Amino acid sequence: MAVFTEVSNTQLDEFLSHYDIGQARSLKGIASGIENSNFYLDTDKGKYVLTIFERLNKDQLPYYLELTSHLGKKCLAVSYPIPRKDGGLLSEINGKPCSIAPCLSGTYVEKPSAKACREMGEMLAKMHNAVEDFPLSQENTKGSAFWLSSMPLLKPYIPDRLYQMLEEEVTRQLELQKSPEYQALPAGAVHADLFRNNALINKNGDDESLAGVIDFYFACNAPFLYDLAVTLNDWTIDLETGEFEPERAQAMLEGYNSVRPLTEEDHKLWQDILSAAALRFWVSRLYDYYMPRPASLLTPHDPPHFSGYTLPL
């Protein structure tokens, strides 16, 4: 969500001519994240978010746009694409694909309350239930193939012991994915990147309530348990120590179970999937840290944040 691609007033006006969302009043870049160029867009008809895709091409995007459209039609609070006048979900700016979505209420909260964690668990379970009839499929672009291709590139930059640790965990996870137990896990289309900065929370004094989920551009088909592990790994840890906070972790799990109870297979592989979720982000953040791309508003994430989770808890 860093700003890699600038948008001129002329380009913006041409873009908006294909939509029925009014005339532009202001456009402001969003500095968080490292994958796409996102902007807050105000028009005389409302508030929106413009996303320009920096890595994904137009042939890769239908899965993500159709998924959020599907979830929006199920009345879930997600950032879904607004159709063009011709019905299409995708446009182009500066030769790059882009889309427009309503700007949801709420804001980023660094340390969500136990109540917000529970609501996030409930929302995640509702999303998993909602995709039972979603027909499209997409591989995890940050899965095992990405791990294997990234490892040789990272080797010159990280200590030998750290590289050995990563290599051992990648090998262990590859073996796990071949197992009948892993193959039996309930699976479908998942967000796969539902960190705190990809959710919006409404605050009223000390009370917090989940407003919506955004940024589905790492969505893929994977075990639902993996999606839960990714979210729990980020939402329910102490930011200073990296340890799970029991109250918030329990609240998220209870929220999820209240809507979609975890299976016996889920319980058996929970620790392994927690490690897989942590490994995915440790590798990707090491990659982005040592091999960054230029951006006018780029805020890199911290790679060591996940290094302690790659072994079973």
Tell me what each language-model feature is:
Residues 110-164, 185-187, 298:
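A cross-family kinase active-site recognition segment
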Residues 36-44, 49-50, 81-82, 174-226:
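Active-site acidic catalytic loop and adjacent metal/ATP-binding pocket
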Residues 1-85, 203-208:
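Conserved NTP-binding catalytic cores of kinases and kinase-like/nucleotidyltransferase enzymes
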Residues 264-274:
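All-alpha amphipathic helical-bundle segments outside canonical DNA-binding/catalytic cores
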Residues 225-261, 275-293:
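Active-site activation/catalytic loop segments of kinase-like enzymes and analogous catalytic loops
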Residues 141, 152-153, 281-313:
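ATP/Mg2+ or Mg2+-diphosphate-binding catalytic cores
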Residues 7-19, 135-136, 150-192, 196, ...:
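An alpha-helical support segment within catalytic cores of ATP-dependent transferases
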Residues 43-136:
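ATP-binding pocket architecture of kinase catalytic cores
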